[in-house]
Protein backbone atom coordinates (compact mmCIF):
# COMPACT_ATOMS: atom_id res chain seq x y z
CA UNK A 1 0.00 0.00 0.00
CA UNK A 2 1.24 3.46 -0.97
CA UNK A 3 -0.33 6.58 0.46
CA UNK A 4 -0.13 9.72 -1.67
CA UNK A 5 -0.58 13.01 0.20
CA UNK A 6 -1.06 16.21 -1.80
CA UNK A 7 -1.43 19.81 -0.71
CA UNK A 8 -0.97 22.08 -3.71
CA UNK A 9 -2.35 21.87 -7.26
CA UNK A 10 1.12 21.21 -8.73
CA UNK A 11 1.61 18.28 -6.37
CA UNK A 12 -1.51 16.58 -7.71
CA UNK A 13 -0.38 17.32 -11.27
CA UNK A 14 2.95 15.60 -10.58
CA UNK A 15 1.26 12.37 -9.47
CA UNK A 16 -1.61 12.25 -11.97
CA UNK A 17 0.36 10.61 -14.84
CA UNK A 18 1.25 7.73 -12.50
CA UNK A 19 -2.34 7.39 -11.24
CA UNK A 20 -3.58 7.31 -14.86
CA UNK A 21 -1.03 4.66 -15.82
CA UNK A 22 -2.02 2.42 -12.93
CA UNK A 23 -5.76 2.86 -13.50
CA UNK A 24 -5.41 2.00 -17.20
CA UNK A 25 -3.01 -0.90 -16.72
CA UNK A 26 -3.89 -4.57 -16.45
CA UNK A 27 -0.68 -5.22 -14.54
CA UNK A 28 -0.55 -5.91 -10.82
CA UNK A 29 0.27 -2.37 -9.64
CA UNK A 30 0.53 -1.35 -5.99
CA UNK A 31 -2.60 -0.64 -4.01
CA UNK A 32 -2.82 3.06 -3.16
CA UNK A 33 -4.87 5.75 -1.49
CA UNK A 34 -4.82 9.54 -1.84
CA UNK A 35 -5.21 12.08 0.95
CA UNK A 36 -5.81 15.58 -0.39
CA UNK A 37 -5.91 19.02 1.14
CA UNK A 38 -5.54 22.61 -0.08
CA UNK A 39 -5.68 23.40 -3.79
CA UNK A 40 -5.01 19.77 -4.77
CA UNK A 41 -8.63 18.94 -3.90
CA UNK A 42 -9.83 20.93 -6.91
CA UNK A 43 -7.47 19.05 -9.23
CA UNK A 44 -8.49 15.58 -8.09
CA UNK A 45 -12.18 16.47 -8.28
CA UNK A 46 -11.78 17.80 -11.82
CA UNK A 47 -10.16 14.53 -12.93
CA UNK A 48 -12.70 12.45 -10.96
CA UNK A 49 -10.05 10.77 -8.84
CA UNK A 50 -11.21 9.68 -5.40
CA UNK A 51 -9.40 10.86 -2.28
CA UNK A 52 -9.71 10.92 1.49
CA UNK A 53 -9.79 14.00 3.71
CA UNK A 54 -8.45 14.39 7.23
CA UNK A 55 -10.86 16.06 9.65
CA UNK A 56 -10.84 16.88 13.33
CA UNK A 57 -7.72 17.35 15.44
CA UNK A 58 -5.05 16.92 12.81
CA UNK A 59 -2.38 15.04 14.81
CA UNK A 60 -4.81 12.50 16.27
CA UNK A 61 -6.66 12.15 12.95
CA UNK A 62 -3.46 11.42 11.01
CA UNK A 63 -2.27 8.94 13.65
CA UNK A 64 -5.64 7.14 13.54
CA UNK A 65 -5.68 7.11 9.73
CA UNK A 66 -2.17 5.62 9.49
CA UNK A 67 -3.01 2.91 12.00
CA UNK A 68 -5.95 1.88 9.80
CA UNK A 69 -4.36 2.16 6.35
CA UNK A 70 -0.88 0.89 7.32
CA UNK A 71 0.98 2.05 4.18
CA UNK A 72 4.46 0.81 3.27
CA UNK A 73 5.32 4.22 1.86
CA UNK A 74 3.90 7.73 2.12
CA UNK A 75 4.72 9.87 -0.92
CA UNK A 76 3.93 13.53 -0.37
CA UNK A 77 4.05 16.83 -2.19
CA UNK A 78 6.31 19.43 -0.58
CA UNK A 79 4.32 22.64 -0.77
CA UNK A 80 5.68 24.40 2.37
CA UNK A 81 2.23 25.87 3.10
CA UNK A 82 0.18 22.78 4.00
CA UNK A 83 0.49 21.66 7.62
CA UNK A 84 -0.97 18.25 6.82
CA UNK A 85 2.13 17.25 4.84
CA UNK A 86 4.40 17.90 7.83
CA UNK A 87 2.08 16.09 10.24
CA UNK A 88 2.10 12.98 8.07
CA UNK A 89 5.91 12.96 8.03
CA UNK A 90 6.16 13.44 11.80
CA UNK A 91 3.51 10.83 12.64
CA UNK A 92 5.02 8.34 10.17
CA UNK A 93 8.42 8.67 11.84
CA UNK A 94 6.86 7.75 15.19
CA UNK A 95 5.53 4.44 13.90
CA UNK A 96 8.28 3.54 11.44
CA UNK A 97 6.57 4.19 8.09
CA UNK A 98 8.89 5.26 5.28
CA UNK A 99 8.22 8.71 3.79
CA UNK A 100 9.32 10.48 0.63
CA UNK A 101 8.32 13.74 -0.95
CA UNK A 102 8.95 15.27 -4.33
CA UNK A 103 10.05 18.59 -5.78
CA UNK A 104 7.67 19.66 -8.55
CA UNK A 105 9.40 22.90 -9.59
CA UNK A 106 12.90 24.35 -9.23
CA UNK A 107 12.29 26.87 -6.44
CA UNK A 108 11.90 27.46 -2.69
CA UNK A 109 13.80 24.31 -1.75
CA UNK A 110 14.72 24.94 1.88
CA UNK A 111 11.41 26.51 2.94
CA UNK A 112 9.62 23.27 2.05
CA UNK A 113 11.37 21.60 4.99
CA UNK A 114 10.80 24.17 7.74
CA UNK A 115 7.82 23.60 10.03
CA UNK A 116 7.26 25.86 13.02
CA UNK A 117 10.85 27.01 12.87
CA UNK A 118 12.38 23.52 12.78
CA UNK A 119 13.69 21.34 9.96
CA UNK A 120 11.41 18.43 9.06
CA UNK A 121 12.68 15.99 6.43
CA UNK A 122 11.18 12.79 5.02
CA UNK A 123 13.35 9.70 4.57
CA UNK A 124 13.83 10.52 0.87
CA UNK A 125 13.42 13.54 -1.38
CA UNK A 126 12.72 13.03 -5.09
CA UNK A 127 14.62 15.60 -7.13
CA UNK A 128 13.83 16.60 -10.73
CA UNK A 129 17.37 16.46 -12.15
CA UNK A 130 21.03 17.11 -11.39
CA UNK A 131 20.52 20.88 -11.46
CA UNK A 132 17.70 20.56 -8.92
CA UNK A 133 19.89 18.34 -6.74
CA UNK A 134 22.80 20.78 -6.89
CA UNK A 135 20.59 23.72 -5.90
CA UNK A 136 18.98 21.76 -3.06
CA UNK A 137 22.35 20.78 -1.60
CA UNK A 138 23.56 24.38 -1.91
CA UNK A 139 20.42 25.43 -0.02
CA UNK A 140 21.38 23.16 2.87
CA UNK A 141 19.31 20.05 2.18
CA UNK A 142 21.19 16.82 3.07
CA UNK A 143 22.49 15.17 -0.12
CA UNK A 144 22.04 11.68 1.35
CA UNK A 145 18.25 12.10 1.25
CA UNK A 146 18.05 13.00 -2.45
CA UNK A 147 17.14 10.67 -5.32
CA UNK A 148 16.74 12.00 -8.88
CA UNK A 149 13.46 10.96 -10.51
CA UNK A 150 12.23 13.70 -12.86
CA UNK A 151 8.91 15.50 -13.26
CA UNK A 152 6.20 13.25 -14.78
CA UNK A 153 3.67 16.02 -15.35
CA UNK A 154 6.12 18.21 -17.27
CA UNK A 155 7.27 15.16 -19.23
CA UNK A 156 3.67 14.49 -20.24
CA UNK A 157 2.77 18.04 -21.30
CA UNK A 158 5.99 18.46 -23.29
CA UNK A 159 5.14 15.52 -25.57
CA UNK A 160 2.41 17.40 -27.46
CA UNK A 161 3.03 21.09 -28.12
CA UNK A 162 0.01 23.13 -29.32
CA UNK A 163 0.29 26.06 -31.76
CA UNK A 164 0.67 29.58 -30.38
CA UNK A 165 -2.50 31.16 -29.02
CA UNK A 166 -3.64 34.78 -29.18
CA UNK A 167 -3.39 35.90 -25.53
CA UNK A 168 -0.86 37.44 -23.15
CA UNK A 169 -1.28 35.34 -20.01
CA UNK A 170 -0.69 36.86 -16.56
CA UNK A 171 -1.01 34.12 -13.92
CA UNK A 172 -1.20 35.65 -10.43
CA UNK A 173 0.39 33.74 -7.55
CA UNK A 174 -0.54 34.20 -3.84
CA UNK A 175 2.76 35.90 -2.96
CA UNK A 176 1.39 37.95 -0.05
CA UNK A 177 -0.08 34.83 1.56
CA UNK A 178 2.98 32.63 1.02
CA UNK A 179 5.87 35.10 1.29
CA UNK A 180 4.55 38.35 2.77
CA UNK A 181 6.91 41.19 1.85
CA UNK A 182 10.07 39.08 1.87
CA UNK A 183 10.64 39.06 -1.91
CA UNK A 184 10.49 42.83 -2.38
CA UNK A 185 7.31 42.57 -4.47
CA UNK A 186 3.96 40.79 -4.47
CA UNK A 187 1.13 40.03 -6.89
CA UNK A 188 -0.10 43.63 -6.73
CA UNK A 189 3.18 45.22 -7.82
CA UNK A 190 3.61 42.49 -10.45
CA UNK A 191 0.17 43.25 -11.86
CA UNK A 192 0.63 47.03 -11.77
CA UNK A 193 3.93 46.90 -13.70
CA UNK A 194 2.57 44.41 -16.23
CA UNK A 195 -0.58 46.42 -16.94
CA UNK A 196 1.41 49.62 -17.47
CA UNK A 197 3.79 47.98 -19.95
CA UNK A 198 1.02 46.20 -21.86
CA UNK A 199 -0.86 49.48 -22.14
CA UNK A 200 2.30 51.23 -23.45
CA UNK A 201 2.63 48.75 -26.32
CA UNK A 202 -1.12 48.82 -27.05
CA UNK A 203 -1.83 45.14 -26.44
CA UNK A 204 -4.43 45.38 -23.67
CA UNK A 205 -7.02 43.55 -25.81
CA UNK A 206 -4.78 40.44 -25.75
CA UNK A 207 -4.53 40.37 -21.96
CA UNK A 208 -5.84 37.42 -19.95
CA UNK A 209 -5.33 37.48 -16.16
CA UNK A 210 -5.84 34.40 -14.02
CA UNK A 211 -5.62 33.76 -10.28
CA UNK A 212 -4.29 30.84 -8.28
CA UNK A 213 -6.92 28.85 -6.31
CA UNK A 214 -5.49 30.33 -3.08
CA UNK A 215 -6.30 33.90 -4.18
CA UNK A 216 -9.75 35.27 -3.36
CA UNK A 217 -11.46 36.60 -6.51
CA UNK A 218 -13.37 39.11 -4.36
CA UNK A 219 -10.10 41.03 -3.98
CA UNK A 220 -10.62 42.28 -7.54
CA UNK A 221 -14.32 43.09 -7.28
CA UNK A 222 -13.83 46.85 -7.18
CA UNK A 223 -10.73 47.07 -9.37
CA UNK A 224 -10.91 48.05 -13.03
CA UNK A 225 -9.35 44.79 -14.15
CA UNK A 226 -10.97 41.52 -15.21
CA UNK A 227 -9.57 38.32 -13.72
CA UNK A 228 -10.63 34.70 -13.97
CA UNK A 229 -9.88 31.54 -12.05
CA UNK A 230 -7.03 29.75 -13.76
CA UNK A 231 -7.92 26.80 -16.00
CA UNK A 232 -4.47 25.29 -15.84
CA UNK A 233 -3.01 24.13 -19.10
CA UNK A 234 -5.85 25.54 -21.21
CA UNK A 235 -4.76 29.08 -20.37
CA UNK A 236 -1.27 28.39 -21.72
CA UNK A 237 -2.65 26.77 -24.88
CA UNK A 238 -4.52 29.98 -25.62
CA UNK A 239 -1.47 32.23 -25.15
CA UNK A 240 1.56 33.33 -27.15
CA UNK A 241 3.18 35.06 -24.15
CA UNK A 242 3.34 34.15 -20.45
CA UNK A 243 4.31 36.89 -17.98
CA UNK A 244 4.73 35.47 -14.50
CA UNK A 245 6.79 35.59 -11.35
CA UNK A 246 8.00 32.00 -10.81
CA UNK A 247 4.99 29.83 -11.60
CA UNK A 248 4.48 26.43 -13.21
CA UNK A 249 2.66 28.17 -16.09
CA UNK A 250 5.95 29.84 -17.02
CA UNK A 251 7.75 26.49 -17.19
CA UNK A 252 5.06 24.99 -19.43
CA UNK A 253 4.97 28.14 -21.54
CA UNK A 254 8.71 27.86 -22.03
CA UNK A 255 8.50 24.17 -22.96
CA UNK A 256 5.77 25.02 -25.47
CA UNK A 257 7.73 27.79 -27.17
CA UNK A 258 5.74 30.70 -25.76
CA UNK A 259 7.45 34.01 -25.13
CA UNK A 260 8.11 33.99 -21.36
CA UNK A 261 9.46 36.57 -18.93
CA UNK A 262 9.85 36.64 -15.16
CA UNK A 263 8.42 39.90 -13.76
CA UNK A 264 9.82 40.59 -10.28
CA UNK A 265 9.92 44.35 -9.54
CA UNK A 266 12.17 45.21 -6.60
CA UNK A 267 13.44 41.65 -6.13
CA UNK A 268 15.63 41.62 -3.01
CA UNK A 269 16.42 37.90 -2.56
CA UNK A 270 17.92 35.19 -4.75
CA UNK A 271 15.83 34.76 -7.88
CA UNK A 272 13.12 32.13 -7.18
CA UNK A 273 12.38 31.67 -10.90
CA UNK A 274 14.48 28.85 -12.37
CA UNK A 275 14.00 30.09 -15.93
CA UNK A 276 15.40 33.56 -15.29
CA UNK A 277 17.94 32.31 -12.71
CA UNK A 278 19.41 30.05 -15.38
CA UNK A 279 19.32 32.78 -18.04
CA UNK A 280 16.68 31.05 -20.17
CA UNK A 281 14.21 33.95 -19.98
CA UNK A 282 14.70 37.59 -18.96
CA UNK A 283 14.25 38.86 -15.41
CA UNK A 284 12.30 42.10 -15.72
CA UNK A 285 11.97 44.73 -12.98
CA UNK A 286 10.53 47.82 -14.72
CA UNK A 287 7.96 48.77 -17.35
CA UNK A 288 10.53 49.95 -19.92
CA UNK A 289 12.21 46.54 -19.92
CA UNK A 290 8.85 44.81 -20.19
CA UNK A 291 7.50 47.00 -23.00
CA UNK A 292 10.71 46.36 -24.99
CA UNK A 293 10.33 42.63 -24.35
CA UNK A 294 6.72 42.67 -25.57
CA UNK A 295 7.86 44.16 -28.87
CA UNK A 296 10.33 41.33 -29.47
CA UNK A 297 9.49 38.18 -31.48
CA UNK A 298 8.93 34.77 -29.92
CA UNK A 299 12.33 33.07 -29.93
CA UNK A 300 12.66 29.98 -27.76
CA UNK A 301 15.40 27.73 -29.11
CA UNK A 302 16.72 26.27 -25.84
CA UNK A 303 13.61 24.32 -24.84
CA UNK A 304 14.70 20.98 -26.42
CA UNK A 305 17.38 20.48 -23.79
CA UNK A 306 14.81 20.71 -20.99
CA UNK A 307 12.34 18.46 -22.83
CA UNK A 308 15.03 15.81 -23.35
CA UNK A 309 15.95 15.97 -19.66
CA UNK A 310 12.35 15.16 -18.68
CA UNK A 311 12.10 11.97 -20.77
CA UNK A 312 11.73 8.88 -18.57
CA UNK A 313 10.36 10.72 -15.53
CA UNK A 314 7.17 8.66 -15.28
CA UNK A 315 9.02 5.37 -15.73
CA UNK A 316 11.45 6.28 -12.95
CA UNK A 317 8.65 7.32 -10.57
CA UNK A 318 6.73 4.13 -11.35
CA UNK A 319 9.82 1.99 -10.73
CA UNK A 320 10.49 3.79 -7.45
CA UNK A 321 6.94 3.28 -6.18
CA UNK A 322 6.82 -0.37 -7.26
CA UNK A 323 10.08 -1.09 -5.44
CA UNK A 324 9.19 0.79 -2.24
CA UNK A 325 5.70 -0.74 -2.02
CA UNK A 326 7.21 -4.19 -1.45
CA UNK A 327 10.38 -3.21 0.45
Language-model segments: residues:
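Active-site and donor-binding regions of nucleotide-sugar-utilizing enzymes
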Residues: 3-157, 173, 215, 249-251, ...
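Conserved catalytic-core segment of nucleotide-activated headgroup transferases in glycan assembly
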Residues: 13-21, 154-221
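Short active-site oxyanion
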Residues: 29-33, 120-125, 206-207, 239-241, ...
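Short acidic-hydrophobic, aromatic-tinged amphipathic segments that line or gate anion-handling sites
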Residues: 52-58, 226-230, 279-293
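Donor nucleotide-activated moiety binding/catalytic core segment of transferases
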Residues: 56-69, 210-256
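Short, well-ordered alpha-helix to beta-strand connector turns
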Residues: 71, 121-122, 143, 165, ...
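Catalytic binding pocket for nucleotide-activated donors in carbohydrate/polymer assembly enzymes
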Residues: 119-122, 248-310
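C-terminal alpha-helical cap of glycosyltransferases
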Residues: 307-327
Amino acid sequence: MILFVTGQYAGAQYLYPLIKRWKNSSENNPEYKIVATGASIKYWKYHQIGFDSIDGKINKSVEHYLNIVKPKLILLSASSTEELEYIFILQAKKIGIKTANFIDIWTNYKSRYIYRGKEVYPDMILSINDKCTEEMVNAGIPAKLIKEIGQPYLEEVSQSIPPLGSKILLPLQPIKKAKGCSLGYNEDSFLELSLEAINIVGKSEQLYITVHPDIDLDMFKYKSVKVDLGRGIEDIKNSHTVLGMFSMQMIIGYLWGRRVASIQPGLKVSDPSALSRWGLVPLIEDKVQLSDFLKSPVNNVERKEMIDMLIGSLDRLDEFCQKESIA
